[in-house]
């Protein structure tokens, strides 16, 4: 028993967020299995699909909140799968631009039902899911502003 009641695991805000994140990541597994993607690879593809122009590795890392040591192996694997290419920027060789291949772009259609499938697995309606997303965005924004 903790000496301080505030140290009870069940009273911590962080623990249900952590547990929900892990459970949600597991829930994506079967939905992504046919495409052969892991959850982090799927997030990377989502970021690429939503980019107006091919991003640099740095821009993609910022969007995904991943450092280059984590992102580079993800990109290498997706490149080996034929879903994207990484090329040095012709105007600045320090920058690497990430571009979807035709197969990577086409995969977007194959996975179009994944977001709805996840909402269904959550056991909440769309309005509740959107409210949760808004609250989480607010928390992230606040924590980033105070970091």
Task: Tell what function each PLM region has.
Residues 20, 24-27, 64, 107-125, ...:
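Alpha-helical linker/hinge and terminal dimerization helices associated
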Residues 1-5, 102, 124-147:
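C-terminal regulatory/oligomerization modules of transcriptional regulators
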């Amino acid at each position: 028993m903790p000496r301080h009641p505030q140290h009870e695991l069940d009273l911590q805000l962080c623990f249900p967020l952590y547990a929900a994140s892990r459970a949600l990541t597991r829930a994506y597994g079967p939905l992504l299995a046919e495409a052969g993607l892991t959850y982090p690879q799927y997030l990377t593809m989502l970021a690429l699909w939503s980019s107006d122009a091919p991003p640099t590795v740095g821009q993609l890392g910022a969007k995904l909140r991943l450092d280059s040591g984590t992102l580079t192996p993800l990109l290498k694997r997706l490149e080996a799968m034929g879903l994207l290419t990484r090329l040095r920027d012709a105007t600045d060789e320090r920058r690497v631009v990430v571009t979807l291949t035709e197969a990577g772009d086409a995969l977007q259609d194959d996975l179009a039902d994944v977001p709805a499938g996840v909402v269904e697995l959550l056991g909440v309606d769309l309005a509740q899911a959107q409210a949760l997303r808004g609250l989480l965005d607010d928390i992230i924004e606040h924590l980033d502003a105070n970091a």
